[in-house]
A protein has these predicted regions:
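Interhelical loop/hinge segments that connect adjacent transmembrane helices in multipass membrane
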Residues: 4, 139, 182-227, 236-237
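Membrane-embedded alpha-helical segments of multi-pass transporters/permeases
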Residues: 23, 27, 31, 53-57, ...
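Hydrophobic alpha-helical transmembrane segments
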Residues: 109-116, 144-189, 206-207, 214, ...
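C-terminal transmembrane helix end/exit motif
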Residues: 60, 127-134, 138, 158-162, ...
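Interfacial/gating helices of multi-pass transporter permease domains
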Residues: 24-50, 109-110, 203-207, 211, ...
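Helix-loop interface residues and adjacent transmembrane-helix termini in multi-pass membrane transporters
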Residues: 32-35, 71, 102-105, 135, ...
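Helix-loop junctions and terminal segments of transmembrane helices
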Residues: 53-71, 132-134, 244, 248-261
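Membrane-water interface segments that mark the loop-to-transmembrane alpha-helix transition
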Residues: 3-19, 44, 54-97, 110-116, ...
Length: 261
């Protein structure tokens, strides 16, 4: 098989392996957690997902599409993502009380403040994962995704079994991001240079802007219904909706994601 075909196979394994792990973990955790736990995490994940869209900002796709991206390009995006993610986290941190008030669920205040840390962690992975995909090293991407998910699931099940409730789901999201980052660093071993170029940022943004708009609108449409349900109904109803919607869309989204890569 050619390199492109092999890469496609590994991208397929990455997405469906992750989907399979998610399915199995949901079956196990459904016996350990309550619907309102899933509802609470679903309410705040809406804001995390949309914020993550802005962190990537289409720069990952722009770097992949660019014929010969330089060290300056990669370093510029790396530093920009860090600063921007910190800014987003600060905004979310101070908006957390208002979001909790919007949903009439005080617990969300602390949940969002803690979970928001994944924005900063994820920002450190953008360039690393982009470089691996640029080199068609989808096997390494698959390892990073599946292994990080597996480790996080094991810890989450342990925490849920010991009565951590919704916090086990928060820790799961953080651990997935941490393990993914560590594995990307292990497989890629790229270190940014001490350089930042506004010219490179502008050039990449001109292409990435359209990808950003597309991703933002897609995520907004996918999550707006959950936002309304979370506001109008209880966290239990939100939890049931979140889990059913996840089961309904996960496989189709995985197929689309493989093709996009």
């Amino acid at each position: 098989m050619g390199k492109v075909t092999i890469s496609f196979v590994w991208a397929f394994i990455q997405k469906f392996g992750n989907t399979f792990l998610s399915f199995i973990s949901n079956i196990i955790l459904a016996r350990l957690l309550l619907p309102e736990d899933y509802g609470a995490i679903g309410m705040i994940m809406i804001f995390i997902v949309i914020s993550n869209t802005f962190i990537d900002g289409g720069f990952g796709s722009a770097l992949i599409q660019k014929t010969n991206p330089t060290t300056k390009d990669y370093s510029t995006i790396f530093y920009w993502n860090i600063f921007f993610s910190i800014g987003l986290y600060i905004v979310l941190y101070f908006c957390a009380p208002f979001i909790a008030s919007f949903y009439k669920l005080p617990l969300l205040n602390n949940l969002l403040k803690v979970l928001g840390v994944v924005l900063i962690i994820n920002s450190l992975s953008v360039v690393q994962s982009t470089q691996l995909r640029k080199k068609l090293k989808f096997k390494e991407c698959a390892y990073a995704t599946v292994i990080s998910s597996l480790l996080a699931v094991c810890v989450t099940v342990f925490l849920a079994y010991n009565g951590m409730g919704v916090w086990s789901l928060v820790i799961q999201q953080i651990l997935v991001s941490v393990f993914s980052l560590l594995l990307y660093l292990y497989f890629n071993k790229w270190i940014p240079s001490l350089v930042f170029s506004w010219k490179s940022l502008k050039e990449l943004f001109n292409f990435g802007f359209f990808m950003l708009c597309s991703s933002f609108l897609n995520n907004l449409c996918n999550n707006i219904q959950g936002l309304i349900i979370g506001r109008q109904f209880s966290s239990t109803v939100m939890g049931l909706y979140t889990q059913s919607a996840k089961l309904a869309t996960e496989s189709s989204n995985s197929i689309a994601s493989v093709v996009d890569q």
